[in-house]
């Protein structure tokens, strides 16, 4: 049965309404405050390559995630939440800027080394350009710097991934405390990326904890930071490396997990099952670490005045469970872009709710700015909006479109229409009836396809013209 075709007028009205609604919502400033006026603390937790169904609360039946399930029960779970890129670096850049990768300049990975360790990357991975080997444009204003207006102290514990030269490190971008690694991946125990040390404390490389599991280290440092700053507003950003595969020389690369967690699952009967168990164990170890962070907030009596945000940086890879979505990390299908997400904010967001509204990670930056009572940087265009009213069930999402580009791969969602044109497949899909993107409607709906392509061309031009300052060159 074919899907009715919207008229051109209706289609353009949708796009126009989207722009107006986004513009209006960016100016909304409604944030509940604790008695005494102290702005809320902020805890942002990001997992790495976690599958859409790698959580009990998202329908997963195999992985134990009691603490994340509890977080969802205490807040709202987002079922229709997207990131801006199907892999690491640009997704993280958008979180910290509230802007499309194409607008903030971080539209590809920062490798920081030639990946020639016997692993056959595609030819484009070897291209050496300043944009790929340096870091995020230093003219971009990141979330922690904006929050300083309200007296926040900010720390990051885990994966940075926005440049390893000193001028790109977290302390130069507004953070006050950093313990973690700077590249896209790491060995969970040696803290090396393909044999090269990658861990930093603040501005200096360190091997002080070599041999200790990274999830435990990032938990430890985040706990320390929250303890030390319990009497002032803080942003604690914890981007775990779990359950990303380890960046080691051996092949196939494993997902490393403590033996006790591996043994807590049924013994695998094959190599494939063993790899899946490693993945599950790494997720459960991370879940336990998150449980410790949430427990400390309760112990310090900060939980009622702390916003907690959790999501995965992109779709799952390896043995992750992305069902019922098509595709995986690196792809423009839903399995690469739609991710698990939950938000807890007592007093602002009802507990135990589910939000099916169309939202993205670019909404987090303006939401947190509004919650803190600070204005975004003057003259900076945000591509997101404060989603608090949406999460509270008080308003529908003003977002009507989202567009993606990863090198030659392109995709766009307008309302419930999703267009994909990529090396892994292409098509036009109606997500209202086909979340698995199994039925290509491009031949049945050629007018819709052409209109979305035309909108994508307009967006591409908008992004090219958005920054009159010119491309970033820091060399």
Residue ranges and their predicted role:
Residues 36-40, 47-63, 70, 79, ...:
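Active-site-proximal cap/lid insertion segments
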Residues 77, 153, 418:
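Residue-level detector of anion-binding/catalytic polar loops
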Residues 104-143, 201:
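His/Cys-centered metal/cofactor-coordination and adjacent catalytic loops
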């Amino acid at each position: 049965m074919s899907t009715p075709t919207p008229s051109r007028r209706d289609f353009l009205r949708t796009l126009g309404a989207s722009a107006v609604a986004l513009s209006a919502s960016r100016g909304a400033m409604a944030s509940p405050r604790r008695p005494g006026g102290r702005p809320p603390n902020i805890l942002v937790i990001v997992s790495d390559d976690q599958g859409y169904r790698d959580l009990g609360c998202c329908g997963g039946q195999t992985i134990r995630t009691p603490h994340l399930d509890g977080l969802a029960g205490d807040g709202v779970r987002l079922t229709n939440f997207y990131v801006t890129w199907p892999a690491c670096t640009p997704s993280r850049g958008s979180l910290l800027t509230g802007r499309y990768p194409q607008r903030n300049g971080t539209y590809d990975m920062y490798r920081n080394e030639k990946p020639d360790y016997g692993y056959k990357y595609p030819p484009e991975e070897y291209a050496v350009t300043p944009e790929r080997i340096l870091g995020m444009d230093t003219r971009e204003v990141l979330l922690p710097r904006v929050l300083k207006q309200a007296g926040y102290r900010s720390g990051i514990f885990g994966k940075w991934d926005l440049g390893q030269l000193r001028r790109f490190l977290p302390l130069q971008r507004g953070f006050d405390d950093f313990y973690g690694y700077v590249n896209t991946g790491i060995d969970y125990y040696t803290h090396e990326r393909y044999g090269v040390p990658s861990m930093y404390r603040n501005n200096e490389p360190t091997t002080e904890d070599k041999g200790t599991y990274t999830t435990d280290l990032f938990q430890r440092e985040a706990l320390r930071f929250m303890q030390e700053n319990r009497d002032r507003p803080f942003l604690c950003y914890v981007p775990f490396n779990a359950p990303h595969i380890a960046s080691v020389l051996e092949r196939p690369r494993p997902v490393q997990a403590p033996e006790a967690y591996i043994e807590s699952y049924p013994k695998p009967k094959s190599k494939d099952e063993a790899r899946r168990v490693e993945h599950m164990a790494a997720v459960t170890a991370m879940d336990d670490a998150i449980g410790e962070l949430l427990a400390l907030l309760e112990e310090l009596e900060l939980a009622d005045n702390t916003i907690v945000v959790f999501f995965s940086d992109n779709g799952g890879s390896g043995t992750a469970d992305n069902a019922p979505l098509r595709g995986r990390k690196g792809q423009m299908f839903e399995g690469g872009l739609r991710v698990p997400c939950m938000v807890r904010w007592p007093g602002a967001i009802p507990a135990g709710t589910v939000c099916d509204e169309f939202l993205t990670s670019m909404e987090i930056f303006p939401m947190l700015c509004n919650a803190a009572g600070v204005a975004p940087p003057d003259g900076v265009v945000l591509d997101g909006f404060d989603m608090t009213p949406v999460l509270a069930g008080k308003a529908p999402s003003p977002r009507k479109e989202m567009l993606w580009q990863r090198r030659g791969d392109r995709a766009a969602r307008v309302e419930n229409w999703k267009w994909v044109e990529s090396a892994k497949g292409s098509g036009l899909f109606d997500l209202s009836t086909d979340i698995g993107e199994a039925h290509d409607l491009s031949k049945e709906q050629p007018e819709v396809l052409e209109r979305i392509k035309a909108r994508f061309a307009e967006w591409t031009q908008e992004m090219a013209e958005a920054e009159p300052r010119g491309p970033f060159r820091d060399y």
